[in-house]
Each structure stands twice: as structure tokens, then as C-alpha cells.
Amino acid sequence: MMKLTCVLIIAVLFLTACQLTTAETRDEYRAVRSSDEVRNSRSCSGSGYGCKNTPCCAGLTCRGPRQGPICL
């Protein structure tokens, strides 16, 4: 009876560890995929949005301090 209990405890711990490592991997890839989708969804920044890494849309000018300019 004691051996069966030990085997069950080890099996539960192993399955829990497998689920945790799988969940971490999925979340990691989801974050990368999400940031790529956001980056690809906007080709220019609208009025009031940052223009440090993305150019302003037509008719807007990038103005402001070097650390955080915005499109006006």
C-alpha cells in the first residue's frame, strides 16, 4: 500500500511539472506573436502617438523631445 501511495504522489508531481513547463512555453510564444501582430498592424503613427520607431502618417510631423516625440 505504501509503494502505491508513493507512485501516485510521484506521478501527480510529474504531471504537474509537465503542465507548468508547457504553460510557460505557450505564454512565451503568445507574447512574441502578439507583439509581431501589433508591430505589423500599424505602418504609421496617428496624431498624438509616438513616432520614435514608427513614422508619422501623411500630413503629420514628428515633434518633441528626442526621448519621446509624437506626431502632430
From Swiss-Prot:
GO terms for cellular component: extracellular region. Disulfide bonds join 44-57, 51-62, 56-71. Residues 1-23 form the signal peptide. InterPro entries: Conotoxin. Keywords: Disulfide bond, Knottin, Neurotoxin, Secreted, Signal, Toxin. GO terms for molecular function: ion channel inhibitor activity; toxin activity. It is found in: Secreted. Expressed by the venom duct. Pfam families: Conotoxin. Residues 24-42 form a propeptide. Belongs to the conotoxin O1 superfamily. The presence of a 'disulfide through disulfide knot' structurally defines this protein as a knottin. This is Conotoxin VnMKLT2-011.
